[in-house]
Amino acid sequence: MSTASAFSSIQGCWFKGERKIRVADKRAKRLTLGSHVASPSSMSFRVSASSSVKPEKDIRIGLLGASGYTGAEIVRLLANHPHFQVTLMTADRKAGQSMESVFPHLRAQKLPTLVSVKDADFSTVDAVFCCLPHGTTQEIIKELPTALKIVDLSADFRLRNIAEYEEWYGQPHKAVELQKEVVYGLTEILREDIKKARLVANPGCYPTTIQLPLVPLLKANLIKHENIIIDAKSGVSGAGRGAKEANLYSEIAEGISSYGVTRHRHVPEIEQGLSDVAQSKVTVSFTPHLMPMIRGMQSTIYVEMAPGVRTEDLHQQLKTSYEDEEFVKVLDEGVVPRTHNVRGSNYCHMSVFPDRIPGRAIIISVIDNLVKGASGQALQNLNIMLGYPETTGLLHQPLFP
């Protein structure tokens, strides 16, 4: 099923009063509380015995791009997963090194030696997390065995419109034939389609904070499709681990800076998802800002309510829509979400406030950009794809202070 039809199918299976109650899923949740890459044409996809780890769990996991922040975060989360074990890790520039030499905080885990993609043997894994930068993922995924379940954390498969991808990302798409089978991985919204997917495009961090609150409100026709303004802020880890002058401590500390003004690459992804559920074109004004903090993301969203709708109605719709969801928490009226309260976790906190301008409302949504905004949601999706309760390995409480 395409993402467009998947979003349309929300009408019959997601919101209370209209959705089919997923008894098994609800029970499962309760029971679980416990770079530069080598060209595929040169790839032989092999790995030496010294680079592998004998699996001790049910599912063997391959991790592409393990030396970045999202790769390291997946390894951290999998440490407490009872069924998934990392048996293959690639990092072209770090090939031959141990993971603990790249990320000393992972020293206690039994992990394979890093290898280059061209030396990886994907017959030794059952599923793959792809944490490579956009533009490097397409050709690699195209060459992987079709039996593998894949969650791609890059932007390469998020946009259905190939021309739109090429316009916003400034490069040709090299795996167009795969796009038709991709399922967009906004877990709480497209869970049923994710269950049947082979290849999931994990959402971007900003689109996650924005779509989670807006999708139920647009679906219920409580807000207008026009004049949506989004002021978003992210910690520096969202820019990746690569050395950049703009991300040096002396450049970031004690200041705030806007970036991607009018042309941030997450805009078409946001508009695609909102337009799908609204069944008409939705446009947004979106400006992100870089904050002097490591983790965390907040989206402050200004919306115009439909005639006769009150902020209490928006709040109640969100409460009803997410009452059975483990990882989305709608706070009590008047309680302001804080990034500190979701740090290191897969939770999203949100709330609604009245604007002083009549007819408008303010929605605040916060996540940890590396967890719910990336690696945590990716693990949530793979759990679903492989038939495990989606909370497995993810019930870490937020870090505080």
Curated annotation (Swiss-Prot):
It is an enzyme of class 1 (oxidoreductase). GO terms for molecular function: copper ion binding; N-acetyl-gamma-glutamyl-phosphate reductase activity; NAD binding; NADP+ binding. The active site is at residue 205. One of its GO terms (cellular component) is chloroplast stroma. Gene3D superfamilies: Dihydrodipicolinate Reductase, domain 2 (3.30.360.10), NAD(P)-binding Rossmann-like Domain (3.40.50.720). Its EC number is 1.2.1.38. It comes from the Eukaryota. Pathway: Amino-acid biosynthesis; L-arginine biosynthesis; N(2)-acetyl-L-ornithine from L-glutamate: step 3/4. GO terms for biological process: L-arginine biosynthetic process. Coiled coil: none annotated. Residues 1-48 form a transit peptide. It catalyses: N-acetyl-L-glutamate 5-semialdehyde + phosphate + NADP(+) = N-acetyl-L-glutamyl 5-phosphate + NADPH + H(+). SUPFAM superfamilies: Glyceraldehyde-3-phosphate dehydrogenase-like, C-terminal domain, NAD(P)-binding Rossmann-fold domains. It is found in: Plastid, Chloroplast. The keyword Phosphoprotein does not apply. Keywords: Amino-acid biosynthesis, Arginine biosynthesis, Chloroplast, NADP, Oxidoreductase, Plastid, Transit peptide. Homotetramer. Belongs to the NAGSA dehydrogenase family. Type 1 subfamily. PANTHER family: N-ACETYL-GAMMA-GLUTAMYL-PHOSPHATE REDUCTASE, CHLOROPLASTIC-RELATED, N-ACETYL-GAMMA-GLUTAMYL-PHOSPHATE REDUCTASE, CHLOROPLASTIC-RELATED-RELATED. This is Probable N-acetyl-gamma-glutamyl-phosphate reductase, chloroplastic.
